[in-house]
Amino acid sequence: VKTCKGYRCENNTGEHPSCVLNINAIIGNRKMNDGEIAEFLEKRRILLDGFSTKDGKTFPTVLELADDGAVNMQSVIGRCPHCGGEVRVGTRAFNCSNYSNQEAPCSFAIWRNIGGHQLTLEEAKELCEKNITSSELEMYREDGSIYRKRLGLAPDKLQIVKI
């Protein structure tokens, strides 16, 4: 049910609510829209851009719906297949947390837009966990023609290649 403050379960009203689900309309200084809420409730995880800190710095994150109804922000999507570090959501790429590690820097990154295809959270997780996407993705050539390829890791596990 949509309310003046956000969204709540229809069973989260009255004197004796039987459900605790309550999602604020504004999370991280960002207004949520009805479509995002519907996808979030269906998948329980959603990658979104446009959140901002109190200082006004914008950032992307993954919202997760916990079993207790809490909404959590999670920037880590998986483990780096190259070095084992954390892969985090960035504005233009999913990056290894060890990129600035002085002793063992890691340059692993998955661009969020590859060949005109906007990678989903699920596709990025597949690349981290299985080293390849499970299905072909629709991409575009420079001339606008469409082609389909799977994405996978190069042998060095540092680069994403089209297969």
Where are these regions (language model features)?
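Basic, low-complexity terminal or inter-domain segments flanking catalytic cores
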Residues: V1-I163
